[in-house]
């Protein structure tokens, strides 16, 4: 929208077969100070404006990194509160999908933790994104995935990973499906 207007973008989508599916991604939605929460609010206001204009119905959000000295319980409790707040802000017509990130310093870095948060939020428009790279990277448990309600999985990112020690890979180590070591056939509902 730096070189074109929102109306031009909306017209383009209206006149083409390609349709927007999700805003990927609202980064670092949790564990923010007051100024950071204001930044998130402003970004969500912008996302909502664009989404309404182009018919986009989902917002994928990523948790914060490097939240020193916070317990898992504290992180979950605060994430639940923030996602409920965001759920109210976007309204029931837009979904929010929490994408856990498979990095040791991510505040929500395993499927089980993310799913616990989504269950506690207990809103029909809040679910989870499963990224097979992140699932593999922090050794998320297949048992947790198998127990999950498939209706709460809103997005699925299909990726593979280089054969490196778990927890050591950044996004630059992503590969196309079946080019790496992730057994993609297992990561499903």
Specify the residue positions occupied by each region the protein language model found.
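Glycine-rich, proline-tolerant flexible connector loops at the mouths of alpha/beta enzymes
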Residues: 1-8, 66
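Active-site acidic/histidine proton-transfer and metal-coordination neighborhood
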Residues: 14-16, 29-127, 137
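Short acidic/polar active-site loop segments enriched in Thr and Asp
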Residues: 19, 57, 154
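N-terminal small/glycine-rich loop or linker at the start of catalytic domains
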Residues: 21-30
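Acidic/histidine-rich catalytic cores of soluble enzymes
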Residues: 23, 85-181
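Short, small-residue-rich loop/turn micro-motifs
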Residues: 27, 63, 160-162
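Conserved small/polar residues in nucleotide/adenosyl-binding loops
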Residues: 187-189
